[in-house]
């Protein structure tokens, strides 16, 4: 991403004092501490919430104790979930400093600091060694990245041979036209880089990855029931205009300008 785009994306998600606000609410809700599972959907800010995390894990089938990179990790909910349920060693990468600060605090609070690390950085230029990860994971993160070819080349670079890339992402739907803004990942069109699923797949395969699973998750998404945010925690603590963004997301899905897709790929 260009420096301008990086700054704009970080600004989209970041808010001054975000970590302090989140942790104040968390400590009030759970004065005696909590496991990551007790947060419900609170730290899974993506379509389908924690149910989507569980569904992606079922498809990816990570080995216990595997080494995971979560790209666009946000507050780190999926990373902590993988650490809790699969004993994975997870690095949560996010472009937004405020999200990284909050993610670290939540990881400490839930007692998972030995398994989950947080790294601030750009998914197109990660600081990791070649072939460092067994699994690269992403949920609703790629929509803010314009250079999909560069993204998938970087994901392949950091994957071990036979490692997997698993993601659930929003793509451009069959209906021509723009979705309605603001959306959960973009307040304005300049921050949203959606592509048709066929183009996605071509770029993935062009980067040297083999597609194992390629699935439209629209029918599944329409059946999902949210897992209540526990202890009174609400996602609007850290997301402005949440109801408006969710409304535009639902409307855009209904009109067919956006779709949700799940994929599992491997590095041969």
Predicted features and spans:
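N-terminal auxiliary segments of SAM/dcSAM-dependent transferases
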Residues: 1-26
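Conserved alpha-helix/loop element of class I SAM-dependent methyltransferases that forms part
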Residues: 29, 46-64
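Class I SAM-dependent methyltransferase SAM/SAH-binding core
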Residues: 67-125
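A short acidic, Gly/Pro-enriched loop at the edge of an enzyme's catalytic core
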Residues: 124-135
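A short glycine-rich, Lys/Arg-flanked "PGG" loop and its adjoining helix->strand segment in the class I
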Residues: 149-164
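Short, glycine-/aromatic-enriched active-site segment of Class I SAM-dependent methyltransferases
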Residues: 170-191
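Short alpha-helix
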Residues: 192-208
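Conserved Class I S-adenosyl-L-methionine
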Residues: 213-268
């Amino acid at each position: 991403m260009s420096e301008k785009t990086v700054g704009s994306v970080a600004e989209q998600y970041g808010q001054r004092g975000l970590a302090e606000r989140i942790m104040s609410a968390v400590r009030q809700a759970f004065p005696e501490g909590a496991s990551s599972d007790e947060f419900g959907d609170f730290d899974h800010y993506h379509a389908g919430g924690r149910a989507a995390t569980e569904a992606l894990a079922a498809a990816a089938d990570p080995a216990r104790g595997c080494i995971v990179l979560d790209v666009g990790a946000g507050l780190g909910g999926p990373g902590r979930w993988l650490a809790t349920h699969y004993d994975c060693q997870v690095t949560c990468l996010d472009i937004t400093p405020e999200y990284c600060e909050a993610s670290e605090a939540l990881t400490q609070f839930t007692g998972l600091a030995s398994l989950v690390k947080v790294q601030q950085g750009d998914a197109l230029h990660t600081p990791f060694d070649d072939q460092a990860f067994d699994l690269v994971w992403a949920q609703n993160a790629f929509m803010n990245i314009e250079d999909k070819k560069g993204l998938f080349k970087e994901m392949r670079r950091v994957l071990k041979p036979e490692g997997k890339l698993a993601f659930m992402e929003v793509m451009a739907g069959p209906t021509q036209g723009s979705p309605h803004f603001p959306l959960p990942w973009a307040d304005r069109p300049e921050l949203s880089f959606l592509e048709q699923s066929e183009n996605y797949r071509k770029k993935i395969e062009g980067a040297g990855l083999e597609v194992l699973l390629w699935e439209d998750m629209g029918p599944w998404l329409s059946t999902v029931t949210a897992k209540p945010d526990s202890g009174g925690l609400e996602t609007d603590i850290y997301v402005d205009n949440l109801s408006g963004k969710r409304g535009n997301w639902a409307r855009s899905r209904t009109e067919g300008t956006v779709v949700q897709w799940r994929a599992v790929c491997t590095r041969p």
